[in-house]
Amino acid sequence: AGAAEDLSKEQVQMLRKAFDMFDRDKKGVIHTNMVSTILRTLGQTFEEKDLKDLIAEIDQDGSGELEFEEFMALAARFLVEEDAEAMQEELREAFRLYDKQGQGFINVSDLRDILRALDDKLTEDELDEMIAEIDTDGSGTVDFDEFMEMMTG
């Protein structure tokens, strides 16, 4: 799961706005029972139980109140996770485009095209190195798991 430092500037600003909205007394804290409302407002879906466990973990003194930093750390777990899922979906799409026969693998020349499309500054040597690292068995093909491992590793 994510950490607060993985949040984008926009996400931090969005969380700050939401936090301030629920910090009615401007004490710099929100009540832990507000957290699920805020997360839902931000379009997050989650299991209540997971949220309760997280709150217990973050609100260590059991005060029932969270400061902005604590709230951010908690929200990051949900927001960053969603980004990771979205990224995985995009990578799956990229993989599918090249796996035209739906065999579950692509050949290394297709992989080279994908890598070049993602980063046009890569040299041929760097591409060769990356491919050698992924295609560890030298089969000339890369399956989706190997591909994901390389892209997210």
UniProtKB/Swiss-Prot annotation:
UniProt-annotated binding residues for Ca(2+) 1: 59, 61, 63, 65, 70
Sites of Blocked amino end (Ala) modification: 1
Name of the protein in question: Troponin C
Similarity comment: Belongs to the troponin C family.
Acetylation is among the record's keywords: no
Function: Troponin is the central regulatory protein of striated muscle contraction. Tn consists of three components: Tn-I which is the inhibitor of actomyosin ATPase, Tn-T which contains the binding site for tropomyosin and Tn-C. The binding of calcium to Tn-C abolishes the inhibitory action of Tn on actin filaments.
Species in which this protein is naturally found: Tachypleus tridentatus
UniProt keywords, alphabetically: Calcium, Metal-binding, Muscle protein, Repeat
One GO CC term, this protein: myosin II complex
Binding site for Ca(2+) 3: 135, 137, 139, 141, 146
